[in-house]
Design a protein with these regions (language model features):
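Active-site micro-motifs of SAM-dependent methyltransferase domains
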Residues: 1-2, 31, 119, 154
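Active-site neighborhood of divalent metal-dependent phosphoester bond hydrolases
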Residues: 2-102
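Conserved strand-to-helix beginnings and helix N-cap segments that scaffold or border functional pockets
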Residues: 3-7, 159-160, 187-189
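Acidic, His/Gly-enriched loop-helix segments that form or flank divalent-metal centers
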Residues: 73-174, 181-185, 197, 202-207, ...
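C-terminal functional module detector
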Residues: 194-231, 240
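Short, basic/aromatic beta-hairpin or loop at an interaction surface
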Residues: 205-216, 252-269
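SH3/SH3-like (including bacterial SH3b) beta-barrel domains
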Residues: 217-231, 263-294
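SH3/SH3-like beta-barrel superfamily modules
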Residues: 230-258, 281-314
Length: 314
């Protein structure tokens, strides 16, 4: 739901399920299986709003891609009944596949769930609370089995340094793996590698779409820095520039330069995309993913950590 290829991705997973032994858990952005043939006033409003707002600004989402494939023109007057009939007839396998996904998968050693496990008796859990369970690692919960979750980008748990790698909390037995792929400008897709021998020596395979280059000269990192992120991203513009603007983070009073294109909402409350002024410690020969190329230097990512490099790249 956070990119232009949701329908293609769904078809890829359906094909993968036919060929190999794999399992999927349902997430809150995948919960469309009962939206195609059950007209209800509240649901009708939600579907229309979702389509007309381009998946809340993250689209086109899965339903819009289905509408495009079916030739349905989405506007404020589009026929919701025709929408249900057409998509239900054209994509029955897709909706059935989504409906077949469990919200929780439990094994002898692991529990897999998109958002997190609700509190209380599992017999009374609501599926939606398993799929959308914000800030699960911040709830102070502890488990006997490893609980592996996504949903809440790991960057939101960090401090003044932005890291997209999974967080493995060995005290609570929670692993959060959402690297903010597509949702974050510097996000990545994380795959947690679980050892066959049942040990806790977890591995990581990560992907991002950025070009990879090599550092030519070493750079000392550190120094004062901050990481402004979603949920706490209100800023005051001190001076505006064409490429960079000087801003003050409203909650902390911290001042930094950020890319002007990261500012939004300037007619009222001004906010910014996730940004940092962290200077990465790097050695000559280190490989980095280049997120932004600017007149001052490069916003890069090295081993999952985002920050600035002010030297030359090969």
């Amino acid at each position: 739901e956070k990119g232009p290829s949701s329908l293609d991705t769904l078809h890829f997973l359906m094909d993968l399920k036919e060929r190999v032994n794999c399992w999927f858990v349902l997430g809150n952005c995948d919960y469309w299986y009962d939206e195609h043939n059950h007209s209800m006033p509240c649901r009708d409003w939600y579907v229309k709003d979702y389509l007309l707002t381009n998946a809340n600004g993250n689209g086109p989402g899965l339903l819009q891609q289905m509408c495009d494939a079916a030739g349905i023109v989405v506007d404020k007057d589009f026929d919701i009944e025709n929408y249900y009939r057409t998509l239900g007839a054209m994509f029955p396998r897709e909706f059935e596949f989504l409906a077949s996904m469990p919200q929780v998968i439990e094994t002898d050693s692991y529990i897999f769930v998109h958002g997190g496990l609700p509190k209380g008796d599992p017999g009374h859990w609501d599926g939606w609370d398993c799929m959308k369970n914000d800030d699960f690692m911040g709830q102070g919960r502890k488990f006997d089995k490893w609980v592996i979750v996504g949903h809440w980008p790991v960057q939101l748990y960090g401090g003044d340094v932005c890291c997209a790698n999974p967080i493995i909390d060995r005290d609570s037995h929670i692993i959060s793996i959402d690297g903010g792929c597509v949702l974050k400008d510097d996000g990545q897709l994380n795959a947690l590698v679980i050892p066959h021998d049942g040990s806790d020596d977890f591995g990581l395979i990560a992907y991002d779409p950025f070009p990879v280059r090599r550092v030519k000269s070493a750079q000392a990192g550190g120094g004062p820095s901050t990481y402004i992120r979603w949920g706490d991203n209100q800023v005051e513009i001190l001076s505006r520039g064409g490429e960079f603007s000087r801003v003050r983070h409203v909650r902390t009073g911290y001042e930094l330069d950020i890319l002007t294109k990261y500012l939004y909402g300037e007619s009222g409350v001004v906010r910014c995309n996730d940004c940092t002024d962290y200077v990465l410690p790097l050695e000559a020969g280190d490989e980095v993913s280049v997120i932004e190329t600017t007149s001052r230097g490069y916003l890069v990512k090295h081993e999952g950590v985002s920050g600035w490099y002010y030297g030359e790249l090969e």
